[in-house]
A protein has these predicted regions:
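Phosphate- and divalent-cation-binding pockets in alpha/beta enzyme and binding domains
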Residues: 15, 34-35, 57-58
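Alpha-helix capping/helix-boundary segments
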Residues: 11-12, 31, 54-55
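A short, acidic, amphipathic alpha-helical segment used as a generic capping/interface helix at domain edges
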Residues: 31-39
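Short, solvent-exposed amphipathic alpha-helical segments in soluble enzyme
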Residues: 21-22, 40-41, 63-67
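C-terminal structural segments of small proteins and small subunits
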Residues: 50, 54-81
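N-terminal first-folded block
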Residues: 1-27
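Short beta->alpha connector loops at strand-helix junctions that form conserved
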Residues: 25-31, 78
């Protein structure tokens, strides 16, 4: 299982890539929601890390995933300051 990250901060995306986490730097709200749906259906994804701002954009989708699926685990991480 792999861990991924969706962020609107390029700094966070780059930092997590350096740590070996596949990261997606996405600004567009529709693209964020589409990527979350895509990743939630991928059996190889075990954890989806999202920054606080991404969580606020896709709260409904993320809560639905958490309630209806055992995996992936959704983890909210702080935005960069």
């Amino acid at each position: 299982m792999r861990m991924v990250c969706i962020s609107r901060s390029n700094d966070i995306a780059i930092g997590l890539r350096l740590a070996g986490v596949q990261s997606f730097f996405i600004k567009d709200e529709k693209e964020i929601k589409d990527k979350i749906r895509e990743l939630s259906k991928d059996a190889n994804v075990g954890i989806i890390n999202v920054t606080e701002d991404v969580y606020e954009i896709a709260k409904t989708e993320l809560n639905s995933i958490s309630k209806t699926q055992d995996l992936p685990l959704i983890v909210k991480i702080p935005n960069s300051k």
